[in-house]
């Protein structure tokens, strides 16, 4: 039926237009894939790897693009798996409720179909890189990344295996973004790669910790037994400050003033957050961190600073290794 203006109505409510529905589905797809969060910092990870490799030849751009897209797709399908599995829990968490709503917009079956499609295409790209190079390493990396993403939300649920969760998720980010790229482009991993990788691992470990700390109040109510819930919000942020401060020290030793300044700034900011939340009640702690901290923005800034520093000053790394 229609009202006087010609708007379609069901039960007295105007129905959204086709274009509105398309936009809603597109945005929901981006949200369940966490693209607004992961796209920037994963691109920056890739650039760190390119810098450590000493650049990329024009002939290798297609392989690098295939590899990078494969990483993004396999990580994205893991985000969908987590969104579907934790939909009820996320509904109660203001910082994640939009993800739960996005799952509802898509529907569970459509979300799972998208997951399978991304997984197949992503692994196919890893296979393509392995075929082109004659090295099974890249397909193995893709398979390991897919398993880690699945196990994050489903048994053995890495998110509930204490600090092992952060070691695995941070390691997966850093290995796929920083370690494998030089192997793809040069065939080797130099000592300088290991030094840069250690710095990146430390600050990435830090922002993974703070990201989880923001959910402690809601995880407790949902009985999700995370590392941050076990040790407490403030202490988790304190650990992040220590790890990021150590990364700043490595950046200084590497002769990267830009990365040093940004990483040290992040460490000092974490100290400020620690001081702010430590005497607050648990719910307020989660609210403060959710308001102040965005893992996408922080990770992109830190990785971009490191990428620029490595690309501009790679030759200086050899002086400390």
Place the predicted regions along the sequence by residue.
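Haloarchaeal acidic low-complexity proteome signature biased toward cell-envelope/secretome components but also
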Residues: 1-32, 289, 321
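Functional transmembrane core segments of multi-pass inner-membrane proteins
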Residues: 51-62, 169-216, 220, 234-235, ...
